[in-house]
Amino acid sequence: LIFICGIVVQVFQFHQENLTFIALLTTRLILPPVSRRSFLKKSGLLVGAAYPAMLALGMLKSSPAHSFELNGSGEGKHILILGGGLAGMTSAYELTKLGYRCTILEARQRTGGRCWSVRKNSTTQEIDHSVQTAQFDEGLYFNAGPSRIPHHHQLTLHYCRELGVPVEIYNNVNEGAYFFSEGGSGPLSNKKIRIREIHNDVRGYTSELLAKAIDQEHVDMAMSKEDAQKVVEYLRAEGGLDIDKLYKASARRGYIDAPGAGEKAGTIADPHKLADILHAGLMSPDFYNVAEYTYELQMTMFQAKGGMDNIAKTLEKKLEKVITLGAEVSSIENTEKGVKVKYKQNQQEKMIEADVCICTIPLPVLSNIHHNFSDDVSRAIDFVPYINTGKIGLQFKRRFWEEDEHVFGGITHTNNDLTQIFYPSYDYLAKKGVLIGYYNFNDKAVKVGSLSNADREKFALEKGAMIHPQYPKEFEKSFSVSWHLTPHSLGGWALYTGESRKTSYKALLQPDKNVYFAGEHTTYLTAWMAGAFESARRTVADVHARMTEQRISYPTTKN
């Protein structure tokens, strides 16, 4: 059957939309006369079976969601790639498709860089800290690096699709998680409050204030009375206002006693007073709705099943022969013929030469490597800062946040040094689980990161127990990561200002003779895996254009 389909496809050069004709022809050739209904059923089965087989045999051309089509061959050219993270491996992955010989030097004993999921037997040793080895139960993990894929990061999703990495929904926004304001004053301070309560109360009070102001013509807006009334009606609906435009309790913010069977109608909780919300600090920047309104954090979001570093691991499997692990670069030198790099592996000094180098090493690390780059590039490397950030994974013997508090995924926000608690978006209803006990930034990350590994755990448990008193009884194991103290990273992601985008950033977009730069720090997608993927493609296009003397700009297609 596949042979017959192949002949038909090759003769008529049909594509997927013409498979009904193929089904008709082949069915007539090999099947006895059948009814229309039976024919349609069997045609569908035929198409479903034949199409994947024809794709595998190269009889039909697939239609990639984010194609990257470059012409010409890189045969005979050697590209050296520094860094085995997503940007480095993606560069090698695309270049090898074009025939280039690639070599990746990775300083760590693993690939992925900051795309790292901590699971059983994962290890790290930070600067001035003891070695940690994760003792999580088999199958449990947390993403120490990137943990979310926005739905509009189509290139990231494209590579998940192309590489066969399954994804699942990541629950970034959960109204059932908590706000916790430590300090402040009044009845809402030092008390966990469901996010939905604060959101609905603040929305209701602000809608009430604006509706009253419009009614009393205290708002300077150029609109007719009819339009003003439409705005007021919108505010009534949006804020849950009554007929008098007053915010009263509604089911939106939850129940004291939930509805049930028979006479159990449920008891609606009274709204918190606006003054109490303010005095507790629950309208401070720590509790702004950034997680909902920021473009990159809007639902739907995804994560790779089994850990985000499965993306990196799948790339590694395709590139095993070109990756050298434990190779710490000490020198990068542009030469007349190409580039020469010195590195240390197994306590031995080694040297490698190539036609072109793609450097994906994070800038704080690159700043400590000898090189002969231009002054502009050197300044960019030395002066672009990276964010200080850290996480801790806490394993509990029972998923009490689900069982006791009905929190399934999402984030609890605090104003203390925990900053955020992330609940896992996988293995719902399982017995055990690992949540991220803190995810902090800047000064808070520096403060917590300076603690010993044991004291980080103690801090996370003590502060976390203020929100979840089940912590002490249910806790089992922990593993913490401070990226600004992690060798070969020295920070979470690059931070640019408007001014540095015009100077330092521009310098890194151009090759320094035979050295090209890639990584999230060479995009406007810093902190995201999409930045690594986009930068890799841009750099591959630039390198290939140079090697084949073509004019190529990225993106190369409209997809």
Residue ranges: model-predicted function:
Residues L325-Y438, I467:
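Mid-domain catalytic core of redox enzymes
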Residues G139-P150, L297-K305, V377-P385, D443-A454, ...:
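Active-site rim elements
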Residues H15, T26-L29, V34, K42, ...:
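Conserved flavin/dinucleotide-binding core of flavoenzymes
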Residues G176, G183, S207-E328, T335-G338, ...:
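Active-site/ligand-binding neighborhood in enzyme catalytic cores
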Residues L1-S35:
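N-terminal secretory signal peptides
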Residues L24-T27, N71-S73, T133-Y141, F287-T300, ...:
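Short glycine/proline-rich turn/loop motifs
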Residues L70-E208, T557-K558:
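N-terminal glycine-rich phosphate/pyrophosphate-binding loop and immediately adjacent elements
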